[in-house]
Amino acid sequence: MKVSINTLSWSNNNVEVVNNHKMVMDHFHIPVNYTEENINHGMWIDRTLNTVDADIFVFMDSDCVPLSRVALDESIDYCKRGYLIGNAQVTNCISAKHDLFCAPSFFVISKEMYFALGKPSAVNNNDRRTDIAQEFTRRAVEQERRIKMHYPTSFQGVPQGGIWRLSGYGYYGIGTVYDNKFYHLYQTRFAKNVGLFVDTCNHIVSGNIGGINRQYDCKSEWAGVLPIEDDYGY
């Protein structure tokens, strides 16, 4: 089966982040199609799905990297078995606080699944209360299809505005590790976060993922200890 691995970067993306992303991908011998274009994220996903000749599509943010080659290969294998795969996320700002979905930070879908879901658009839709790529999971849930989400286990720092609740599961934030398989920085526009990404990428390529900073446990209760962006019910 033909697999297409894709990463989008905009002209204002931090060059150091993009270069370290490429370093990790090269280290694992992962062939990535990098698109350098100022295009809406969802529109880029839609265009890729409709113009690239592939059976399986992997979308990965420029600040999201696998901790191993096995992590990527396992996700692709799940996709071959009929699963929709991605990092677990919710979007608190659109009244969908408990609506977990496979986020586009790391997202895997087959062409067959895409057509079976009715070729939904990845563009965010306020009427449907969906964020980027969320409609894919919404449709998969409605059709009772197989879904595999990678859940956060630790994070490194507090985002501007406070840490994020993941429905009833726990919390996530800057430098989140998912299932010890993927790492997503978030908020790369802030220079203080870039160093965390560089440090993590260096640990990955040196084979020392055990040395990655995992300061905060995602399932611990941080209410009253760390600022929370959207404290449900208050």
Where are these regions (language model features)?
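N-terminal anchoring/stem segment of glycosyltransferases
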Residues: 1-53
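Conserved catalytic core of nucleotide-sugar-dependent glycosyltransferases
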Residues: 65-139
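C-terminal catalytic/acceptor-binding lobe
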Residues: 130-234
